[in-house]
């Protein structure tokens, strides 16, 4: 597909890399000459130095025959303007990143009036993810499928869970838990396990289950399941605003620490149910005086990654509450993986994942389309949900007879109101949603899960 990408910041760079690696013809547009030249030299993309809201620049980029137009500059208004001009000048799908909370209640109106195909608000998405984690504090990561009915949950295995030396196939009968272990991180590597795989203390385990079955499983292995009742948030940006709204709607007591007096006053007016403290959140004595040791959750949301990391490490030393850390710079994820920071949230990953998911779905106008895509475990694993629109080599055949690719696990089938953890005798049918976890990147269609070389 021909894609025009306006904006070459962190998200734009991640998109240029991912989309070009998947074989798309990507043209990057930005006013920053150095950034454009860097992307041209680093990835297989074209580049134009210019304003993405200029019809002349858009024409030079080939807007007339573009399939997708993506605007991820640092300005919401510029992103919307670029998309509006792109829709007028071409016949493409337009995607905009819009971050300002003042637009949050107007997104549907904006999409309809301008004709934008999709709008992504990374701060709102991050707030929703953090809210899920605080409602299920035993998990370090939660992704949702099937409209929220199915969850992919990650946790750290310790001696307290009593699963050291247990084979995965023994878990359902041993714990009476209908869950499926999908991936295990061990010694720096990632394994897509089979039933004979034996768990060890220290493993980072990712499993799939319904919310009810996940809750029951965590109870069986002595993991915390009660939602937090209070939250101490350091940093009063957009994520803190959205998160506070989510938490207060669920009757969680919220305290926000914001060092900027004007912003603290603004938050106090916008969030009358929250306690807003105009203080320096990096002041350790202040945090202790505000009850850090008894807080059920601590969320570091400042604009400085290093400060968030240090704050979380300090909170870990003094609190047994749920810890959540926001990180913006994607290149630090391998370093952070070695630190015990609780749950780490990457808003920029969410933006990139959403847009890549949308582009992949557009490629498959017929057949089995991607409905949901997550890149998990430090971008080493993809979890995908496909909608089955037509019969293929993957449908109507017992799963035990399908020749699946290596390092791929078919985890779940949703059929109407039914959620199936599949067994060998189950079959994929037209109308199903199918969830797979794989080490292979770039799957576009359900048929891609089959090992063509192994078919007889």
Please name every model-derived segment.
Residues 1-456:
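Cytosolic regulatory regions of ion transport systems
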